[in-house]
Structure formats: structure tokens, C-alpha cells
Amino acid sequence: MEKKKGISMAVIKRLPKYHRYLQELMENDVDRISSKELSEKIGFTASQIRQDLNCFGDFGQQGYGYNVKELYNNIGSILGLTRDYNTVIIGAGNIGQAIANYNSFNRLGFKLKGIFDANPRMFGIKIRDVEIQDVEKLKDFVKENDIEIGIICVPRTNAQKVCNDLVEGGIKGIWNFAPIDLEVPKDIRVENVHLSESMMTLVYLLNHNDVK
């Protein structure tokens, strides 16, 4: 199973949704499913699903459909969920704590190794057995513990400094919840989650009916 060159980001962003729905099917003891049945559950067309999956190999069988468990495992492999990723959270406020307590975090392979904050009153407090540390220790911690992913949950004014420390420590990917577009080297991957932008999109949809 080899990924073809030139896979669009739109395809990549649909894979986690396939993975999530396939997990639900397995939990409901569904062994196989057609692209048509999958399209009815997910909301994409059957043709779109087939095209997306064909970017990575031949998974279905004519007249049979897809083996749910096999497809789930294959998509997990494509997404890189076959190994663990050492992860840190920066910002132990509401968002940071919610992410640290997210039940699927560990199951998906994201191993929380450290939580950092600038507030001295937070130092030493544990969240899921991980002690909150001084953010000034972040760069060295990333270097010494082979941290690959940093999750930024700090205010906009502090986010770029945190990002710089992560990059200097050798981070490979950043999940950014701060309302800022971070400046990073080209080889650092950043996935932004701008909550206010998502809310503004929702407000638009509430007030307009012109979206296809």
C-alpha cells in the first residue's frame, strides 16, 4: 500500500472522518459496508469515497464492499497511527486541561509527556499523572525527551515565543489553538484550530442560505 504523489489536503482531511465512522461501525459489530452505505452515514458521495481511498490502494471488492476492520486499520496506517508520538501541551488553562483529559488521546498514540505553563501557582499540579512544569523548561524538555508534537494552548501574545522554543527544541509538528498564524520553518507542520473562526462560520450559516 503506497501513497501516490500529489495527494490533496482535502483528501487527507477526510481520512480522519472515515476512520472515526469505521470505528463506530466496528463497535456496532458491522463487518462490511459498501461505499454507498458509507456515503449515507458520512455525507460524502460514494464516488468521492472511492476516489479518496483509491489514492492509497485498492481496498474494496466488487459486490462485497469494504471489510470494515481492514479498512479501519489501513486508514489508521495511512494516517500514521501505527506508532506513538511523544507530545507536550503548553498552556494548562481550560483548553489545555480539556485536551489532556481527552479519552482518545492515548488510544490514538499521542503520549502526553509534559504540560507547561507560565503561572507558578500551577507548577507541580498533576493532570492524568503528568506534572505541570515551568514553560521556561520547555525547550530543553523537548530536546531531552524526543518530543514530536507540541500543542499550543496559550494566549496569542505568547504563542510565537512558545512556538520558537518548540522549534529550537526540535519539534516536528504543532497543533495550534492560539488565534495567530505562527511563523515556522518550512519543515515544521502546523495544524491550526482557530475556535473563533469556526464560530464565525457557524454564525454565517445561521444567517445565510446560499451555501451549497
UniProtKB/Swiss-Prot annotation:
The gene is rex. Signal peptide: none annotated. Modulates transcription in response to changes in cellular NADH/NAD(+) redox state. The keyword Hydrolase does not apply. The keyword Transcription applies. It comes from the Bacteria. NAD(+) binds at residues 91-96. GO terms for molecular function: DNA binding; DNA-binding transcription factor activity. It comes from Clostridium perfringens (strain 13 / Type A). Homodimer. Keywords: Cytoplasm, DNA-binding, NAD, Repressor, Transcription, Transcription regulation. Belongs to the transcriptional regulatory Rex family. One of its GO terms (cellular component) is cytoplasm. Pfam families: CoA_binding, Put_DNA-bind_N. It is found in: Cytoplasm. InterPro entries: CoA-bd, NAD(P)-bd_dom_sf, Rex_DNA-bd_C_dom, Tscrpt_rep_Rex, WH-like_DNA-bd_sf, WH_DNA-bd_sf. Gene3D superfamilies: NAD(P)-binding Rossmann-like Domain, Winged helix-like DNA-binding domain superfamily/Winged helix DNA-binding domain. GO terms for biological process: negative regulation of DNA-templated transcription; response to redox state. This is Redox-sensing transcriptional repressor Rex. NCBIfam families: PRK05472.1-3, PRK05472.1-4, PRK05472.2-2, PRK05472.2-3, PRK05472.2-4, PRK05472.2-5. Its main location: cytoplasm. Residues 17-56 bind DNA.
